[in-house]
Amino acid sequence: MRVRVAVLKVVIVILLLVLCVEFVFYLFVVPATSFAKVEFSGNVTISPEYLMKAAGLTGKEKWMSLDGFTISERLASVPLLAQVEVLKKFPDTMHVHVVERVAIALGFVHVQGRAMPVQIDKTGTVFSVGTAPLDTVLPVVSGLEFRNPRVGLRVHDQLVPLFVQLDNLSKRNPLLLGEISEISIEQKRHGGYDLALYLVRAPIRVRMDKNLSEEKLRYVILLVDALREWQTQRRIKELDVRGGTAVYR
């Protein structure tokens, strides 16, 4: 009986030692010696290789040596990214979730005498110069001024609500947004701005205030459709809805 108890104690001690060794191995050895596994999510158009390079990673870093805050800061400085979240998972994984910027409108700037498109997101941030999305038709916003156009620039603070409204339209009623060909920003003499809309369906310039809501746009399109019937009898060039009543010229 005593022999069995002694053997059982030895077995228990051995098991405890094995567990301690495994605990130490996973707690200290694996994080300090294993190459970190970097996982990305949320990237649709950006490759993992691009993100690795932007984060300053080579794929040979040890998990223990990774600084999540530094990596997050590096990726947050990439103009193509709107949000970045870095999470280190014990013992050897780092997960990086990104949210890419999405173009809500196009602008045009002049670089060395050439007109080039710039992509602008809902925050009014320019994140691409010289390229336009091939699979999406976006409204053009004219009247923007950039002295030195480059990625990372933002439009003036007073214009940001316009891009927020465009983003809301794209989510709630993209077909309605697709009716807009161009939005021209017209600065007022004493501050603020009005808008001039050019619609796809008719060559009529629509002047309105900066409230580009879904209801207002529906109202404008309804008026334009009514005026189209008069186009054969009258040459209407402009519709003004800024004063609460519609005036055509």
Per-range role (PLM):
Residues 39-73:
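Short extracytoplasmic
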Residues 80-83:
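Glycine-centered tight turns that cap/initiate beta-strands
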Residues 1-28, 33-35, 53-60, 73, ...:
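Charged, solvent-exposed interaction patches on well-folded alpha/beta domains
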